[in-house]
């Protein structure tokens, strides 16, 4: 059977591949500690679940408007105003089946074959593949631990060509945990201001999971004049431990939002009606429900960073946001390769070695466009983290 060139250009999710391999080994009786997951280990808060149960009992189980219910859109508008000082109208809001669909809709609505999308690396694994589905060209700007995984204005300017159509910024970052400051975003905005045809996608999914104590800002807080060509992407998955509910949302120029809604109308149509009620309860409800989770992430972040940095050959920064440690393992790879312990000098070989010998599942940095690193999620118990570090330290000693 012939498959399209489009589908052959994309790869299965590396994070899901790690999870699947870890699950297979676990089923074989191995005591696997999974640190590959990209979701909180907390339960959805009770008041959110109760809202969904009430919706079911009230029969709110039919189609809704493609772009989301009017009341959920209003909750999103209120959230943007209250927390981000951003003003949107209902026609500038779209609710989708997860943040991934929001970005998918945006790319399909704005990118033509050959159009270039600038993506700083390391990046969320889905960005480039979604661009490839639209037959666009991902253009990567490489960073590393030396740059704290953040691009400079000069790097951005050098990446721009006449074919550049979109720039993607993700802060706090999955996988690196880096967070752009107001001043850094202002500097990037100064470059983008010179190129009025470039759209800006700011992925704020980890907005509330800030670990450094500083307040959240995105590029529109830094450069309000760019609002007419910026789409703000967000969702309830991470902040409210609602990954399985599949509700993402975005705010942006009405013409782009309408185009995105047209794309969505021919794929999933409306997001799940019950999940929309739950998302509305999350956005309108008591926001203190996030506090215990974020405090736990801060404690785990501090422990994991200190513990990993005590192991010879690996190094990581204290994450400023999200719930990942993005670990530089280049020295460890070099040593193991010299000793002919690894099959090759890739981070994939290293992560396979750690999985098979230490029984700890991690995602290789190359999955995020950053060879020589591994991503460890600390969205798990402290006991799991302590045991995982103990195993990795023993393996690399």
Curated annotation (Swiss-Prot):
Residues annotated with N6-(pyridoxal phosphate)lysine modification: 238
Subcellular location: Cytoplasm
Cofactor(s) required, per the database record: pyridoxal 5'-phosphate
Main location: cytoplasm
Recorded superkingdom: Bacteria
Catalytic activity line of the entry: L-aspartate + 2-oxoglutarate = oxaloacetate + L-glutamate; L-arogenate + 2-oxoglutarate = prephenate + L-glutamate
Subunit structure: Homodimer.
Function, in words: Catalyzes the reversible conversion of aspartate and 2-oxoglutarate to glutamate and oxaloacetate. Can also transaminate prephenate in the presence of glutamate, with lower efficiency.
PANTHER family the UniProt entry points to: ASPARTATE AMINOTRANSFERASE
Entry protein name: Aspartate/prephenate aminotransferase
Source organism of this protein record: Nitrosomonas europaea (strain ATCC 19718 / CIP 103999 / KCTC 2705 / NBRC 14298)
Gene transcribed to yield this protein: aatA
């Amino acid at each position: 059977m012939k498959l399209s060139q489009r589908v052959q250009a994309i790869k299965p999710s590396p994070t899901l591949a790690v999870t699947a391999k870890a699950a297979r080994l676990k089923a074989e009786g191995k005591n696997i500690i999974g640190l590959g997951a990209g979701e909180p280990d907390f339960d959805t808060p009770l008041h959110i679940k109760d809202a969904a149960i009430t919706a079911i009992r009230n029969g709110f189980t039919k189609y809704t408007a493609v772009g989301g219910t009017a009341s959920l859109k209003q909750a999103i508008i209120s959230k943007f105003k209250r927390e981000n000082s951003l003003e949107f109208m209902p026609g500038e809001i779209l609710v989708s089946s997860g943040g991934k669909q929001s970005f998918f809709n945006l790319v399909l609505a704005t990118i033509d074959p050959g159009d270039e999308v600038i993506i700083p690396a390391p990046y969320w694994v889905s960005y480039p593949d979604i661009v490839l589905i639209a037959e666009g060209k991902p253009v990567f700007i490489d960073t590393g631990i030396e740059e704290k995984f953040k691009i400079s204005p000069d790097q951005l300017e050098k990446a721009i060509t006449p074919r550049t159509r979109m720039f993607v910024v993700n802060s706090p970052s999955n996988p690196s945990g880096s967070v752009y400051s107001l001043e850094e975003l202002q500097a990037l905005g100064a470059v983008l201001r010179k190129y009025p045809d470039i759209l800006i996608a700011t992925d704020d999914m980890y907005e509330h999971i800030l670990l450094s104590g500083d307040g959240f800002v995105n590029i529109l807080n830094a450069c309000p004049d760019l609002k007419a060509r910026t789409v703000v992407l967000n969702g309830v998955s991470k902040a409210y431990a609602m990954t399985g509910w599949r509700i993402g949302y975005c705010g942006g120029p009405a013409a782009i939002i309408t185009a995105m809604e047209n794309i969505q109308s021919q794929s999933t149509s409306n997001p799940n009606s019950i999940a929309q009620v739950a998302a509305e309860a999350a956005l309108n409800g008591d926001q203190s429900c996030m506090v215990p989770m974020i405090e736990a992430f801060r404690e785990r972040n501090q422990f994991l960073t200190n513990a990993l940095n005590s192991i010879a050959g690996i190094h990581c920064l204290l994450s400023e946001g999200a719930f990942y440690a993005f670990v530089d393992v280049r020295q460890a790879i070099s040593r193991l390769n010299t000793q002919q312990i690894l099959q090759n000098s890739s981070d994939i070989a290293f992560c396979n070695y750690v999985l098979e010998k230490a029984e700890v599942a991690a995602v290789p940095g190359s999955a995020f466009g950053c060879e020589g690193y591994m991503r460890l999620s600390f969205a798990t118990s402290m006991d799991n983290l302590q045991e995982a570090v103990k195993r990795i330290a023993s393996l690399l000693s």
